């Protein structure tokens, strides 16, 4: 069955396209692994990271995340802070129209708390973000993560929470 599928691709000349022509064999997709989560390359208002609860994989159209020794839910929940938002503005590339793009090395440099404690539960973050309440998540995580766990005062992070509006 697989052989017939490959032969059909060759009849349709899929193997002559650029992506397939540089592979050996042409039908083998490189670097396929199941990540813990995904980070979107192009962002508008905030660097979105999502948990890979379905066990899916992807090509290079979206960044794949691997959490090492830490629950991915904690990593992702802790990225929903003004610190990460400001970091994305500094690390990313702006292509105009409000779109910011993060290449792999830029995404790896995004700042987030070193101690992954106390952020809102990811299920709650997900519900609020889907309801269009990203600001509520950022405000609550600012209180929990930046103030309570990192020890910053409100004055310390108030310039950070305004950075996306300033840039």
List each language-model region with its residue ranges.
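Polybasic, glycine- and aromatic-enriched phosphate-binding surface used to engage nucleic acids
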Residues: 1-127, 131, 137, 144-145
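In a subset of proteins, long, contiguous C-terminal domains/tails are tracked
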Residues: 129-167
């Amino acid at each position: 069955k697989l052989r017939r599928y490959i032969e059909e691709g060759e009849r349709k000349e899929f193997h002559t396209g650029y992506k397939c022509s540089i592979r050996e064999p042409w039908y083998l997709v490189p670097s396929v692994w199941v990540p813990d989560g995904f980070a979107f390359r192009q962002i508008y208002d905030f660097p979105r990271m999502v948990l890979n609860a379905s066990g899916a994989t992807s090509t290079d159209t979206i960044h794949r995340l691997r959490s090492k020794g830490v629950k991915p839910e904690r990593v992702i929940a802790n990225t929903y802070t003004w610190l990460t938002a400001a970091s994305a503005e500094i690390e990313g590339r702006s292509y105009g129209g409000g779109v910011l793009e993060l290449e792999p090395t830029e995404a790896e440099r995004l700042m987030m708390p070193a101690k992954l404690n106390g952020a809102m539960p990811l299920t709650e973050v997900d519900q609020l973000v889907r309801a269009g309440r990203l600001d509520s998540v950022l405000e609550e995580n600012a209180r929990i993560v930046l103030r309570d766990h990192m020890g910053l005062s409100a004055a310390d992070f108030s310039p950070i929470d305004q950075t996306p509006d300033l840039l």
